[in-house]
Regions:
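Non-catalytic cap/lid and distal C-terminal segments of serine-dependent acyl enzymes
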Residues: 1-285
Length: 285
């Protein structure tokens, strides 16, 4: 548990699911008159400590904001249970037919199922944010959403469909591949809003350099061919680079996009680098 962290457990009235918030409030500086900037971090059970330590270290520089960090997670100390619980919250609906094809057919079925992302956004807006704002003064013009993998996918969905809920978005190794890249169905409408000057936001999309490099790991319940198929289907690096290039081409003065490939990192190694870069991107002034 990170220093100065508070824990808030609640059961959602939106979807009747149990959540745990990990909240770290900065203490080294006076509270800004407008309230604190805040980072809402998906998968709080997994990455909260990294995010807090990174934010506090970077805030040693006077030109870096020291934010409140909120990890959104589940009331469990088990990594496996947290990974299972996240599957419904961080995915959109997917057909049973599609679940029988490709990489996802080789994955263990979560006990929660899939397809609860829309309700998850409501949980954040209607239940997470009010609890945090009751605890500490928040600057509603300095809200960041950050997530890795399916959390990165969720962050992209928020960028495209819930843009006004946050001002900055950090998608680390987003699972764009999910459900035949269904998230990209919302890209065209978002791009039109950007061109029309209706979007004011900043976004960082990053990925590990090795995520599209085939690597077989013996000892896991997957064959060498399974790993090869997964690498080819997921297209982690090309998906991020192609999306980043398209968004950068929009060239709007109110929308800033940065794409980063983290050298030497694979999917499970990239969160520390992605979070560190995300804190710098969103908090440096």
């Amino acid at each position: 548990m990170a220093l100065n962290a508070r824990v808030i457990d609640f059961t959602s009235k939106v979807n009747d699911r149990a959540y745990r918030l990990f909240v770290s409030i900065p203490t080294r500086r006076p509270v800004p008159p407008e309230g604190h900037a805040v980072v809402y971090l998906i998968d709080g059970n997994l990455h909260f400590g990294i995010a807090v330590d990174t934010a506090r270290i970077q805030a040693c520089w006077p030109d870096v904001i020291d934010p409140v960090v909120v990890g959104i997670g589940y009331p469990t100390d088990s990594v496996n249970q947290a990974l299972d619980q996240r599957m419904i919250d961080l995915t959109t609906p997917i057909s049973e037919e599609r679940l029988k094809k490709g990489f996802i057919a080789k994955m263990p079925r979560p006990t929660t199922g899939y397809g609860g992302m829309d309700e998850y956004f409501r949980v954040i807006e209607e239940e997470v944010k009010p609890r945090v704002e009751a605890l500490v003064a928040i600057n509603k013009l300095e809200q960041v959403l950050m997530g890795h993998s399916l959390g990165g996918l969720t962050t992209l969905h928020a960028l495209f469909r819930h843009t006004a809920s946050f001002q900055q978005f950090v998608a680390i190794a987003p699972s764009i591949w999910y459900n035949d890249r269904a998230v990209l169905a919302h890209e065209a409408a978002f791009s039109e809003r950007v061109r029309a000057g209706q979007v004011k936001a900043r976004a960082l999309i990053s990925v590990g350099e090795l995520e599209s490099t085939f690597r077989f790991v013996p000892g896991l319940p997957a064959s060498e061919q399974d790993f090869r198929d997964m690498t080819e289907e997921c297209r982690m690096v090309p998906n991020v680079q192609e999306l980043g290039a398209r968004l950068a081409a929009l060239a709007s003065p109110q929308f800033e996009i940065e794409t980063v490939v983290h050298a030497g990192d694979d999917h499970n190694m990239v969160p520390p680098a992605g979070i560190a870069r995300g804190i710098r991107f969103t908090m440096r002034r």
